[in-house]
Each structure stands twice: as structure tokens, then as C-alpha cells.
Amino acid sequence: MASPIDDKMSPAERRAGVSLAAIFALRMLGLFLILPVFAVHAHGMPGGDNAAMVGMAIGAYGLTQAFLQIPFGTASDRFGRKPVIVFGLVLFVIGSVVAAMAQDVQMVIVGRVIQGAGAISAAVTALAADLTRDQHRTKIMAMIGSSIGLVFAISMVAAPLLYALIGMSGLFWLTAVLAVAAIFTVMFVVPAAPPVPRAIGRFSEVLGNGQLMRLNFGVFALHLMQTAMWVLVPAGLVRAGLPMVEHWKVYLPAVLLSFVVMVPAIIMAEKKGAMKRVFNSAIILLLLVQVGMYVEGGAGMWPLAILLTLFFVAFNVLEATQPSWISRVAPPHAKGTALGIYNTLQSIGLFLGGALGGWLVQNVGPGSVSLLGGGLAVVWLILASGMVAPATRRVAAA
């Protein structure tokens, strides 16, 4: 039997981390493959000349997710994680098929709305927390976060090539197939989930917890900044002389280099009891990136590449540490609910980042997007300074 101070993950924990990261990766790869090519493809579809409709087709997924993260998270507390995850993935498959068969932008929007109805992020994250001990939870969250970053980089490279081979309809069909693979992973690869304690009246417990609400603001700000960045970065790279089809040459190294920095940061946060120090340092780095984006103004490729790499470092550290922190602070019987609220704020941030970022660029100017991001980072840093890092309970593997 492992000792109580054993820092090695058990085989069951490693299996849980790899399989849950695979579920996120399969689902997110299907989503990310659409992003680099849909706006161009939509010009050839009925309704594609309406920029607002095209934007809605891209953003409708996040909007539906925002409404359903809490119900799915709460349902996973009541009925178990796996049944809720499978149900959500089935909805995602249906939405992908609807979008694949769409003949106009309006039907693509319908498909994207149904895709977003499969809001499983909270349930998957809660299951990851259920299946891991405290001292390894941030590592598991880092595995999940890294898988998302990696498939994002892969999608930036693969999407134009796959689009040329199978078209937009083929990409949506591929998305459906990937989601089916995720369903089989949930059913046959993910370890059995422990029983979920059931309780009533826990929603107010979560909303009344100041620590949780600070983390909820943090994920809202983080993903608003992330989506708004993509309003600026592609256009900045084009202005710097890099054609759209070659943007992956910046994105892929930036993501991979960020992982090299992120992993030691996560290990230090776990082993050295430096969670709050690493957390606040990542927020400060986000603030510096926003200042750099404002000062640099998209004038050169190398400054943009460096800023993007630094952004991914901060983003990946925060993306790994925040869900782990939530799962430790939340009442044990309400982890699904707490993570549902957390993922709702994440989805709202994703939606507003694109919508507000685009509006600001159109009506105020590109610099206003960086000012907004910098302001959010300052508020977040102030809120985070009042947080107390959760204690890590070191327990032996079963």
C-alpha cells in the first residue's frame, strides 16, 4: 500500500487523467477544426453575406453552453457523472449531424445550438475531481488543459488541409465521429466513478462562497480576454506579412513552448505550496501581455509571437489551477454545481470576448480591446489577492 506521503499518481488516477483528457480533446478538436475555415466557407452559403449571422453560427455554441452548464453540473451531482456526460455527448453528435446536413447558415446555427446543449464540461471536470486525490488534482487538470491547447494547435494546422479534402460538411461529420469516440471512451475506458453524495439546498452554498465567486470572475475574465485576443492576433499577423495559411507557424510553437514553461509552474504550485504565488504571477503576466498588445499595436510578427507565447503560458497555468482550486473549495456534495456555475461564466466570457472584441475594433479601435483586457486583469488581481490557497490533503492511493 502506498504511504500517505506518496507523490506518485496511482494507475487508476493516470487512467482517469488520460481518458478524461481524451474526451475533452476529441470534443474540442471537432469544435476547433471549424473555427479557422467557417467564416470563409460561409460566403458561399445562403445567409453567408450577413456577418452577424456568420458570427452567430460561430458563437451560438458558447451561448447555449452558458445556459446549460449549471443544469448539467447539478444533474451530475444528482444522477451521476457518466450518464450526464454520455447524454451531453449524444446531443453534441446530433448537433454535428444537423450542421453537416445544413444547406444555409441558419441551419448551421441550429446545429451549433444543439451542439452547445451538450454542456458536459462541468460534469467531466467534477468526475476528474472525484477520481483523483488532492495532491494530484492540479496535475490532472493540467493534463486536460494541455490536451485542449494541443488540439487547438493541431486544428490550426489541420483545418485548412481537411477542408480542402472533405469540405465543411465533412468537417462536421468528422466532429460527430469524434464525439462518438468520446462516448465509447466514457463508457469503456474512464474508471468507475465513486458514488456522488446527494444533498439539497447546495446552490445557495455555492453562490454565497466568496472564494468560489472570485474564481468564477477569474474564468470569465480569462476567457473573455482569450476570445478577444483572436479578434486582434490573426489580423495583426496578416499586417506583419504572414499569410493566413501560415499562421500555424506562430500558433504551434507558441502553444508547445507554453507547455514547457507551464509544467514546472504546476509542479511548483503543487509540491512547494506555492499555489497562490503561481496563480497571481500568471494574472500579472496576463496584464503585461495586454499592455504589450496595446503598445506593440500589431506592427511586427516577432513581438506578436512572443506576446502570444506568454499569453498561452499564463492561460494554461490558470486553466489548470482554477478548476482544481474550485473542486477543493466547493462543498463535497456540490462539486458539480460549483463547476457548472464556473463553466457558465467561462462560456459567457467566450461569447462576450468575441462579440465585444469585434464591436470595439469596429467602433473604437484595436487598442480598446487590449485596454479592456488590461482592466479585467487588474480587477482580477485585486480580487485574487484576497484569496486563500486551499490546503492539499495528501492521502494514500487506494
Question: What are the language-model segments listed below?
Answer:
Residues 2-14, 190-221:
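Juxtamembrane intracellular "pre-TM" segments in multi-pass secondary transporters
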Residues 67-103:
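Conserved MFS/SLC helix-loop-helix module at the cytosolic interface between two early adjacent transmembrane helices
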Residues 68-79, 260-274, 361:
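Helix-to-loop junctions at the C-terminal end of transmembrane segments
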Residues 78-88, 270-284:
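Cytoplasmic membrane-interface "Motif A"-like loop-to-helix N-cap segments
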Residues 120-132, 317-330:
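Intracellular juxtamembrane helix-capping segments at the cytosolic ends
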Residues 176-195, 383-388:
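C-terminal membrane-cytosol helix-exit motif in multi-pass small-molecule transporters
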Residues 276-322:
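C-terminal transmembrane helical hairpin of 12-TM major facilitator-type secondary transporters
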